[in-house]
């Protein structure tokens, strides 16, 4: 879960503790309040990065790339650094799930807070994070839901990536490129990565849908394409909750990977198809990038 969730839990516990103390006399209530306050202060300190470095704060801008609405996380002083010495940054393409929009990762996913906290701790590299609306037509029916995973977005991605590289100082080196997504975005990530095998050294599938139902060219011989992708030895990271409704599909895919002796990294959490888990997964995935 996101780094400081424990703080909220302990604050809530302390508030409940104080509420139960309402029947105590005045002196005891003061003692209980001071004890709870010290407890909470300790949790704040424990949750804060143990670092004397100045905190680095990225910024998020809205953009349109190849007609696709996007949110883009930029490292601190991005424009000045590019203008001064043409600094080039690693890039992560991060995709939302069905019914989501381009700002899901910044609003519900807490991407900015997670990135800034991990940067302050020195646990991640600075990078640009491009968060596209990978489902620009909001599905409202079963047919439209099927169209959201029809191959259209995956086949469009090379042009989207090319324009992203033209607009931002991001690396074209596959070793400095990552792609990830949750649920439908995990499905898109999986199939973009084999469609463009060799273009991404880091691939993250968070609670992903797996098997395509469309006959689009992107999905032709996808199992063979995954084998070809794995020959390039990417970090292939899969995360899923034990109660996730996609758990069995992911388990089946993992068995297939193992039967074919294809290496991957697997993380299994408690819980289901939730933002608590996806915050946890992105935090773990970010720490592995561009090492």
Question: At which residue positions do the language-model features occur?
Answer:
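Bacterial Sec-dependent N-terminal signal peptides
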Residues: 2, 6-7, 15-52
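Non-catalytic cap/lid and distal C-terminal segments of serine-dependent acyl enzymes
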Residues: 48-291
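Short intrinsically disordered, low-complexity coil segments enriched in acidic
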Residues: 1-7, 70-75
């Amino acid at each position: 879960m996101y780094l400081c969730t424990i703080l909220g839990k302990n604050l809530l516990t302390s508030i409940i503790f104080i509420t139960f103390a309402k029947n105590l006399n005045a002196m005891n209530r003061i003692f209980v309040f001071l004890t709870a306050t010290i407890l909470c202060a300790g949790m704040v300190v424990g949750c804060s990065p143990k670092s004397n470095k100045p905190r680095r704060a990225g910024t998020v801008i809205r953009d349109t790339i190849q007609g696709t609405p996007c949110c883009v996380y930029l490292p601190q002083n991005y424009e000045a650094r590019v203008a001064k010495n043409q600094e080039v940054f690693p890039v992560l393409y991060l995709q939302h799930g069905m019914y989501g929009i381009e700002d899901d990762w910044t609003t519900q996913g807490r991407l900015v807070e997670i990135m800034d906290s991990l940067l302050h701790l020195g646990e991640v590299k600075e990078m640009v994070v491009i968060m596209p609306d990978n489902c620009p037509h909001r599905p409202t029916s079963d047919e439209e839901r099927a169209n959201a995973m029809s191959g259209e977005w995956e086949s469009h991605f090379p042009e989207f990536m090319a324009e992203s590289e033209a607009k931002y100082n991001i690396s074209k080196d596959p070793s400095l490129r990552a792609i990830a997504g949750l649920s439908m975005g995990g499905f898109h990530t999986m199939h973009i990565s084999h469609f463009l095998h060799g273009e991404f050294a880091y691939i993250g599938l968070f609670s992903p849908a797996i098997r395509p139902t469309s006959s689009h060219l992107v999905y032709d011989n996808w199992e063979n394409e995954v084998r070809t992708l794995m020959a390039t030895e990417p970090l292939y990271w899969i995360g899923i909750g034990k109660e996730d409704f996609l758990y069995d599909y992911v388990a089946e895919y993992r068995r297939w990977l193992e039967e074919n002796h294809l290496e991957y990294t697997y993380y299994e959490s408690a819980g289901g198809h939730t933002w608590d888990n996806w915050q946890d997964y992105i935090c773990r995935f970010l720490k592995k990038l561009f090492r």
